[in-house]
Amino acid sequence: MGRTYIVEESVGRYLSSINLQGKTFVSGLLIGQCSSQKDYVILASRTPPKEEQNENLEHPKAKLDNLDEEWVTEHANQVSRMLPGGILVLGVFIITPLEMGNDFQNALRRLVFAVEKTLSKKRLWSFTEEEVSERVTLHICSSTKKIFCRTYDICDPKSSAKPADWKYQNGLSALWISFECTVHINIHIPLSATSLSYSLERNTKNGLARWAKQIENGIYLINGQVKDEDGDLLGGQKKSFKGNAQAASHCFDVRVLTQLLLNSDHRSTATVQICSGSVNLKGTVKCRAYVHSNKPKVKDAVQAVKRDILNTVADRCEILFEDLLLNETPEKKVMKKEFHILPHRVFAHVAGSTVMLCDYKFGDESDEEIKDHFLEMLDQKIQIKDLEIAEEINTGVIAAFAVCSPCCGYLLSLLQ
């Protein structure tokens, strides 16, 4: 038996409202949350059209090659930055005027694998063996209104399509459980002489991977308590929520305790390497995560928070490096020491849901630009007055880059 996708009714209305307007197809992303029993789809977002794109009314089958994998995967990459912990890209949808054959299904298969491959490259974490590895493709025929829902196991390159159920539900995420966490980071990434041949971005990502292990191995206090990860998150509480007062109480505060010293049973040896510079990240980040309200486990909450911490730091660094590349001056060849403020996080509600999506904002960007970005990437109209700035400017993360001559210092590293 295939997987079941429980879908917010507003997603169905959104998909039905998409007008092909002479195009041979419209593609997009399906966004939500996985669980062991079923998956939840809370949002769909069409792929933004390319500026130079000029569709005509040729027969759809002649246009299969126009399914631009690179464009769709870049959209998925941008959207993934806007998702809080626990929310991810579940798959892709495509709307066509006609029912299509096997060639088209093969194109969809390639697309869903390409999206997952792109997203996995940037993650500082990996899926566990227990997690669902199936991703969904949804094909809607606009003329017959037929829906073809199939899944593929993205861990198996030879995976074949499996049929899946697509069921709508009103108010799906209206009472989901939210988690808020403030993390103070102070990450020092030394640059050895041998690592200078790599880009600063690559060196930073390698350093973040080491920091990620601290976050993965941390102790997580939920409302000040350490809970059994296999226990029910809402153990001892009412299972049904009636009224906003009870629903509002299900926002948990999470604190992270990371290990500073090695345990006594860990043996280590010290090595000395020539240090040619360093990258330092210091400041405070605000994290949010969401879990469905269908008998969630403590481990579901902890995992969602962990991943939001890792994602938001990695995404901010990636955005900063993209900005530096765009604004690079040709005459600037040697960097001695620089300070940059990483972009701040801004949240906005999804209509009819407790879930808030996010974006990142540099100090010189306007709220209007953030509003436009939500519309372009997520096809979501938001009000500027509803934007919630997560971090104040004076508490955000500052990145300090210092690249010196190869003989200016030494790196002492502990090897376990």
Where are these regions (language model features)?
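Active-site beta-loop-alpha substructure in enzyme catalytic cores
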Residues: V92
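C-terminal functional modules of predominantly eukaryotic multidomain proteins
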Residues: C155-Q416
